[in-house]
Amino acid sequence: MRRITRIFVHCTASWQETTTMESLRREFMDKGWKAPGYHYVVFPDGKVFKMLEEGLVANGVKDYNSNSIHVAWVGGIKYDVKRRLIPVDNRTDEQKVALFDLLTKLKIRYRGAMILGHRDISPDLNHNGVIDPWERIKQCPCFDAYEEYADINKIG
């Protein structure tokens, strides 16, 4: 039995209209990974799909996977005015509700775990105790998961 200490929130950095479970599985297989990057995926309609059993290790955050559960929402990208891909919090209302419900259930199951965004493990380069935007290795999940789920993190 794995000891879960972190629940990471991700975005898939993919298009909400065209992403499927099969396209996500194919993406991870094409990377040569033995396991997908997420345990759960939340689609724009709020439906939650299990991609990997919780007892198995996903490839969500390098060096943090053995003791983590990974949850992703589909989306997180758009084009800017110059047609460059940029990160965006484009979660639907249904995704927000489904994420909150799923994360609450996971936090109750793994009471000692902390809910974080993928970006929250970036190094604090200026040692001010905060991961500033310029320090982030990734923008994922495109919003402040630690702040948004602070009340859930109090469970435990």
Can you annotate each of these PLM segments?
Residues 48-62, 124-137:
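Charged, often glycine-rich, active-site loop that binds/positions anionic groups
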Residues 23-25, 40, 56-58, 64, ...:
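Generic preference for flexible, low-structure residues
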Residues 1-56:
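Short, conserved "active-site rim" segments that organize catalytic pockets and cofactor/ligand binding
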Residues 1-8, 12, 67, 76-156:
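Basic/polar, cationic surfaces and motifs that engage anionic cell-wall
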Residues 1, 58-66, 72:
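Short glycine/proline-enriched loop/turn "hinge" motifs that connect secondary-structure elements
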Residues 19-21, 52-54, 60-61, 83-85, ...:
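Generic alpha-helix signal with a bias toward terminal, lower-confidence helices
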